[in-house]
Amino acid sequence: MEGTAESQTPDLRDVEGKVGRKIPEGLLRGLRGECELGTSGDVLLPGAPSTGHGLGDKIMALRMELAYLRAIDVKILQQLVTLNEGIEAVRWLLEERGTLTSHCSSLTSSQYSLTGGSPGRSRRGSWDSLPDTSSTDRLDSVSIGSFLDTVTPRELDEQGLPGPSCPEIDWAKVIPTEDRARTEVDMTSTKLGSLTATWKLPGDGLQCGPPEPSEDGNANQGFEAHWYWGQCQDDVTFL
């Protein structure tokens, strides 16, 4: 039996000579066991222990499997490290892009707020910030005569109250020469008419005394004053 097993074992001397090392006994025993299993016609059950393998062979097989698993673990770890580096690179790119996008959006929003919402109005932004002068134009269009009309009644009411005398206006500079002469003649005739109405001769039985103003004279004076004021107002408006 032993002779048949040794004869079926392959000759490994050439391999030992080329490698320079002796073939391990475990490998030889494994080869011998395979040969015995191939020659014997006995069928072993899956759970039954093999007769040709000892405890040392099982330990060696377990060590080889552990080394193989460790090599696989090392490869998996290397792949995981490479994958982690790629993920970190992509994450950094996304963060930088988000930062640049937010910065650009903030700059764009500030530019739009300064330009008033449209790039075309950027050149006119300074002009839009200037105050509106339309109100001053409206004030300039108001005539001086209407302004005097609003101020005159209040001033006339205040003339009856005691207070400092108002400065007199040099009407000679305001009223033209012809109108001024006509106004003086009319006022002189009005005064003469009032004096004629109040003063009478001594033969009429009336005592001479200071003239008393009549109602007609007061009405005429009021009319003349009103006409005089209207003429002045027209002249000022014309100027």
Swiss-Prot record:
UniProt feature, compositional bias: Low complexity: 105-116
Superkingdom of the organism of origin: Eukaryota
Positions of post-translational Phosphoserine modification: 118, 126, 129
Free-text description of this protein's post-translational modifications in UniProt: Phosphorylated.
InterPro entries: LURA1/LRA25 (IPR039499), LURAP1 (IPR037443)
Positions annotated as LRR repeat: 55-83, 93-114
Keyword line: Cytoplasm, Leucine-rich repeat, Phosphoprotein, Repeat
UniProt-annotated location(s): Cytoplasm
Region of interest called Disordered, as start-end residue ranges on this chain: 105-138
Gene Ontology CC terms, in alphabetical order: cytoplasm; cytosol; intracellular membrane-bounded organelle
GO BP annotations, alphabetical order: positive regulation of canonical NF-kappaB signal transduction; positive regulation of cytokine production
Keyword hit for Repeat: yes
Keyword Transferase belongs to the record: no
Quaternary data: Forms a tripartite complex with CDC42BPA/CDC42BPB and MYO18A acting as an adapter connecting both. Its binding to CDC42BPA/CDC42BPB results in their activation by abolition of their negative autoregulation. Interacts with CDC42BPA and CDC42BPB.
Primary role: Acts as an activator of the canonical NF-kappa-B pathway and drive the production of pro-inflammatory cytokines. Promotes the antigen (Ag)-presenting and priming function of dendritic cells via the canonical NF-kappa-B pathway. In concert with MYO18A and CDC42BPA/CDC42BPB, is involved in modulating lamellar actomyosin retrograde flow that is crucial to cell protrusion and migration. Activates CDC42BPA/CDC42BPB and targets it to actomyosin through its interaction with MYO18A, leading to MYL9/MLC2 phosphorylation and MYH9/MYH10-dependent actomyosin assembly in the lamella.
Name this protein carries in UniProt: Leucine rich adaptor protein 1
Organism: Mus musculus (Mouse)
Gene designation: Lurap1
